Amino acid sequence: MSATATLPETDAPTGDDAATPPGDDTSATAAASSPAPIKVRRMSFHPDDNIGRRHFADGDLVMSHVVSVLSGLFPEGEDYFVRSVRHFRDRIDDPVLKKQVAGFIGQEAIHGREHRDLNDHLSRMGYLSNVVDRFTKFSLGVDERLAPPHYRLAVTAALEHYTATLAEVLLGDDEAQAMFSEDEVRSLLMWHAIEESEHKA
């Protein structure tokens, strides 16, 4: 939906009035196109107390392992994204973009913390989340030693856009959400998806 208002038909403007076409509300359009703020929501989940069943994704063994592997990727991945963005933070002059970067870093830090807690619990249940976490840390460490900063920033932008797209699919699919019958897992993933959708390029 366009933010530009539809004005009633009038006689053709003359003089100074002709400079601004009817319906061309520049200020409204600018406001609509300005980036939304990235808000840091300080969440805290408690998987130890609230995940009972071993196959927590609606009793589905395969999907439960898929989620555990994805969760294992997140903490080190989020830290990598933060370092990639932070490297360029001091070069930013735009105050709006600076606020967005600060919000992005804050969100990613909390994502990593909450998924580490979930990974610890899933590992105690027999999942390989922490093994995936260690492998991810090693792999990204090699990447950071070999790849230049602008490449890492490009990777961050691409992966954030990809995960934001997946997040929007999850948020719009009631059937997919219903698979996470354990409330704590569903709440964590939905919160993460909502915030990831704010990072879309």
Label each residue range with its predicted role.
Residues 2-8, 16, 24-201:
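Non-heme di-metal
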Residues 12, 18-19:
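Acidic, Ala/Val/Gly-enriched low-complexity intrinsically disordered segments
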